[in-house]
Structure formats: structure tokens, C-alpha cells
Amino acid sequence: MQTTIQQRSGASAWQQFCEWVTSTDNRLYVGWFGVLMIPTLLAATTCFIVAFIAAPPVDIDGIREPVAGSLLYGNNIISGAVVPSSNAIGLHFYPIWEAASLDEWLYNGGPFQLVIFHFLIGIYAYMGREWELSYRLGMRPWICIAYSAPVAAASAVFLVYPFGQGSFSDAMPLGISGTFNYMLVFQAEHNILMHPFHMLGVAGVFGGSLFSAMHGSLVTSSLVRETTESESQNYGYKFGQEEETYNIVAAHGYFGRLIFQYASFNNSRSLHFFLAAWPVVGIWFTALGVSTMAFNLNGFNFNQSILDSQGRVLNTWADILNRAGLGMEVMHERNAHNFPLDLAAAESAPVALQAPAIG
């Protein structure tokens, strides 16, 4: 019988903790960015779920007209949202301890700030964790670069846009219909559909979907035949097998004949770089567009650009968009004291011919 005696490690508890955090042998890599990511995302997720279910109405416009967003106050999954913090709070940081009571904090939309700030810190840390794991494994850092696109988009709608507009009440609500409401109001106030950076983002998202579907279907179809002509190719493979089944030469030949030769990649790395770069660059541009429109550098205005020989306006698609935007804007601003300036821009009639003497 043999007895094995293992010498106790002389490492301190802190050193053991550091080794565990940075170990790539863990089932899920933690990393130093993970130490920040885990608690912040847990806090954001917990607060979001509780607020979505049970938060009381929020005075989003700061005019004592609370808007209910939670399920217990009559909403469903589609209409429910975590309502942004009040316009009365503006850009002030509004943690729980800044409110006189918990009821006041809830009424002014404090949970929204708690969720978005923890969420943003969490996704920034997740991006850093992607780089950290790549570094530990000796990989190149492009995974976190690709992830920076949705991070930039989230930062644009939750942080940059409220900064530019002067209030967190202008941020995107955390819900399905709230997202659509944000998009409609954004079009009304900034004409985003006529902004080139938004157009690049649309090309990036839809083009990325198209290229992804084309690539996946082409790879799935380009099998190395392991069977005879008289039986199904599928008999030559087991799902999930380790051996290579895909022939890039065959795929290149097929696609080159389907479109034309130079539309097809014969280099796998070039192909996958293109598949990654196309949507990422498109979403970068959209985030940049939202960030510039946050400061009212809006989309192109081609309203009433075409006139006939008599000076009458010939409406174009730009004029149709403008009319739709005006309608969305007056529905959005329910309180009359904040009437949209572009609708109130008619010539003002004097109410007094002479200013009264003062004193």
C-alpha cells in the first residue's frame, strides 16, 4: 500500500484567489473584468426584472403625469417597460440615497438609472473580459473589437443621447413598445431616416444577415462526398463529427459561377473578416449617427425642395416623412406648454401696438 503526501501550498489566500480568477481551466472564465462584470450585471438584471413586474408609475415628463410601465399596473409583455427617470431630475445622478424616500425615488424613475448604469458598466466589463481571455489564450483581440459595435449602440441610446438632450427622460425606455416609441420620436425630432450614418447601419444589419445566411447555407451544402452516387451524401457523415466535411474550393467554384468569379472568396480568413467587419462597421456608424443627432446635428432636410413653374411645391418622399414626423411629434408632446417649435413657427401677431410704460 502506498501513501501519497502532498505538500500544502505556501500561497496566501489572496494569491490563490488571483490564480482562480485568471485561470483558463475554469468552466467559465472569470477574469479581473469578470469581477466587475458579474455583480453589475446581476444588479442590473435583478432591478430590471423587479421594476418591469412591480414598479409604480413614473413622472417621466416632470409635469405630474405619471406613466405606468410595469406588469402589475396593467401592462403586458409588449407594452411594459422600465420607464426612464423624470425630466425633473434631468441629468442629475439619482441613486436611492439622494431621494427623500423610496416612494419618491420610484416616482421619479430611479430604477431606470440603476439599471442602465450597472448595465453599461457590465457590458464594458464583458468587452474587457473578452479581450482578457483572448490575451490569456494567446489569441488576437478582434472578438472584443467586434463586440464594441453593440456596446457603442447601447452607449449611444442610454448615455450619449440623454447627455445631448439634457435629460435621462429622453433615453430609450427598457421595453418593447418603449423602444418603438423611442424610434418614432427620434425620427420626428431628428429625421434619422435621412441621415447617411443610419443608412449605413441598415446596410450593415441587413447585409450582415444576408451574408450570414449565404455563408452558412453554402458551407452546409459544400460536402466532401464520402458515399457513392447512388446513395445519399448524408450517410457519409455523423452530426458533430470532428473530421472536416467542408471543401472551400467547391464552395468557391459554386459561388463564382452563381454570381461571378470575383464575388467569391477563395481565402477563408478574408471571407470571415468580411463577415465580421460588414455589420460591425455599419453599427459603429449608426451609433456615431445617434451620438451626433443627440446634439441636434440632424438628418438631411430636403423638404419642399422641388417646385413647379408656378412656385407650387411638388411633394417628395422627404415631405411625406416630414408630415409623418410632425404628427409623431405632437402626439409625443402631450403638454401644451412644450409645443413643438416647428409647428409654432408661424408669424406672430402683435397683441399691443405700444409697450406699456413700466413704473
Curated annotation (Swiss-Prot):
Chlorophyll a ChlzD1 binds at residue 118. Its main location: membrane. One of its GO terms (biological process) is response to herbicide. Keywords: Calcium, Chlorophyll, Chromophore, Electron transport, Herbicide resistance, Iron, Magnesium, Manganese, Membrane, Metal-binding, Oxidoreductase, Photosynthesis, Photosystem II, Thylakoid, Transmembrane, Transmembrane helix, Transport. A quinone binds at residues 215, 264-265. Tyr-161 forms a radical intermediate that is referred to as redox-active TyrZ, YZ or Y-Z. C-terminally processed by CtpA; processing is essential to allow assembly of the oxygen-evolving complex and thus photosynthetic growth. The record marks 344-345 as: Cleavage. GO terms for molecular function: chlorophyll binding; electron transporter, transferring electrons within the cyclic electron transport pathway of photosynthesis activity; iron ion binding; oxidoreductase activity, acting on diphenols and related substances as donors, oxygen as acceptor; oxygen evolving activity. Belongs to the reaction center PufL/M/PsbA/D family. Chlorophyll a PD1 binds at residue 198. Photosystem II (PSII) is a light-driven water:plastoquinone oxidoreductase that uses light energy to abstract electrons from H(2)O, generating O(2) and a proton gradient subsequently used for ATP formation. It consists of a core antenna complex that captures photons, and an electron transfer chain that converts photonic excitation into a charge separation. The D1/D2 (PsbA/PsbD) reaction center heterodimer binds P680, the primary electron donor of PSII as well as several subsequent electron acceptors. Cyanobacteria usually contain more than 2 copies of the psbA gene. 2 of the reaction center chlorophylls (ChlD1 and ChlD2) are entirely coordinated by water. HAMAP family: PSII_PsbA_D1 (MF_01379). This is Photosystem II protein D1 1. The record marks 161 as: Tyrosine radical intermediate. GO terms for cellular component: photosystem II; plasma membrane-derived thylakoid membrane. The D1/D2 heterodimer binds P680, chlorophylls that are the primary electron donor of PSII, and subsequent electron acceptors. It shares a non-heme iron and each subunit binds pheophytin, quinone, additional chlorophylls, carotenoids and lipids. D1 provides most of the ligands for the Mn4-Ca-O5 cluster of the oxygen-evolving complex (OEC). There is also a Cl(-1) ion associated with D1 and D2, which is required for oxygen evolution. The PSII complex binds additional chlorophylls, carotenoids and specific lipids. [CaMn4O5] cluster binds at residues 170, 189, 332-333, 342, 344. It catalyses: 2 a plastoquinone + 4 hnu + 2 H2O = 2 a plastoquinol + O2. It comes from the Bacteria. The record marks 190 as: Stabilizes free radical intermediate.
